[in-house]
């Protein structure tokens, strides 16, 4: 595993971390029990099986 040779300053660490941005989750339209809902793709299968309450979305 790579280890740093020199200590990184707190200012450099904070400025690097501040550049990180989270992306919005892409939503997919799904029809469940005659109701069209927009939910994240990873929850589609669980929603169709009834494991997730789609009323939250």
UniProtKB/Swiss-Prot annotation:
A Gene Ontology biological process term: translation
Name of encoding gene: rpmF
Cellular component, GO annotation: large ribosomal subunit
Protein name, as recorded: Large ribosomal subunit protein bL32
Bias (Basic residues): 1-19
Domain of life, per lineage: Bacteria
Matches recorded under InterPro entries: Ribosomal_bL32, Ribosomal_zn-bd
Spans annotated as Disordered: 1-20
HAMAP family: Ribosomal_bL32
Residues in coiled coil: none
């Amino acid at each position: 595993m790579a280890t740093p040779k020199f200590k990184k300053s707190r200012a450099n660490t904070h400025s690097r971390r501040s550049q990180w941005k989270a992306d919005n989750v892409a939503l997919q339209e799904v029809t469940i029990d005659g109701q069209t809902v927009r939910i994240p793709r990873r929850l589609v299968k669980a929603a169709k099986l009834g494991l997730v309450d789609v009323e939250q979305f």
